[in-house]
Amino acid sequence: MPELVPIRYGRMLRSPFTFLRGSAGLMACDLATTPTTGLRVQACGDCHLLNFGMFATPERNLVFDMNDFDETLPAPWEWDVKRLAASVAVAARDNKLSDEEGRDAAVECVRAYREHLRECSKMSPLEVWYERLDMETLIEKAPDAKTKKMRADMAAKAHERIGEYLFPKMTVAVGGRRRLVDQPPVLFHVAEKGAEKRFRDGVEDYRLSLPDDRRVLFDRYRLEDFAVKVVGIGSVGTRCLVALFFSPEGHPLLLQFKEACPSVLAPYAGKSVYANQGQRVVVGQRLMQTSSDILLGWTAGQRGYHFFGRQLRDMKFSIPLEGATAAGLKRYAAICGTGLARAHAKSGDAAKLSGYLGKTDAFDQAIGKFALAYADQTVRDHAALVAAVKAGRIKALVEEDL
């Protein structure tokens, strides 16, 4: 949706870190020129610090894991590690930390990745698939009382981020029916003729992608309303819709249908084996994630667009990085590195990866240097975007100015 692209650029303008978040394709192009071992895993494709967070498992447990898989594709494992480490270094600068502190946090991230891969290499495949990092454990293992309270508070906030809590804020009663509230330009209804029929057809196609038992659940709900929703940074400009459903008893269900385009890794790692890009995302997410949304599925629009569907939020909560201390960033980076190792071990050969990485910190230090170098590159790229907007070559819409 070209009319939304200026919002994307506006969000990327905020800082080098938001620029990095919105430029997965640019970094994929850069990473494709770097050496690799030839070992491949199911890669995230957009692995950065804010693509980790909390969410609910089907058993309603709160876990910490990767939570965004729009770009997932089988690819070299190094690409995820380098993007994650670079995001650590850029986030450090965003928080006014020194380059030494940023490098140390990036090194700690990679060290945690390397050491957890070694642990995974000693497990059976089933044990790797069963492994998860739940918030209760993270709270219990907090290094001090302050960190423990902070993690407990964030977990409490995550428990509130479910459809039942979100529903009153996003809807209003109109003529005896609940409707999504327009909040242009970030949430608005589609006035185009035939849009509702196309959407209903797409929902039926999505239904067919669900396992039989999940269809029984989904069939308890009926569609009431839908609207376009602008989400994230890199996703702005792609089609994303939020849909409101109700059960016969009046219980709400909010689903998000997000357009799935070919992965930014595809030009360099090879195209997906799945014709529907939504299916690519769903399969990759199920392969990498600890546990996935019970209503995760895919669909195709009549105009050739591909989508994947899931519950809106469902206890999804990203850890705020603003104001992070050097010690706090280091701890968080290590947790993310551990999560990435587990995700890679599910699809890759942990023993081979661990054997390559070895027991010394040589790889950790090398990626730490890379992270700082790429942080410099990100600053230059962000400055180029700022200059292009000021010169009028690129149109950006800063939402704070609306």
Where are each of the predicted segments found?
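Ordered core of a single globular domain
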Residues: 172-221
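Conserved ATP-binding subdomain of kinase catalytic cores across diverse folds
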Residues: 1-44, 49-162, 202-402
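Gly/Ser/Thr-rich loops at beta-strand to alpha-helix junctions
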Residues: 165
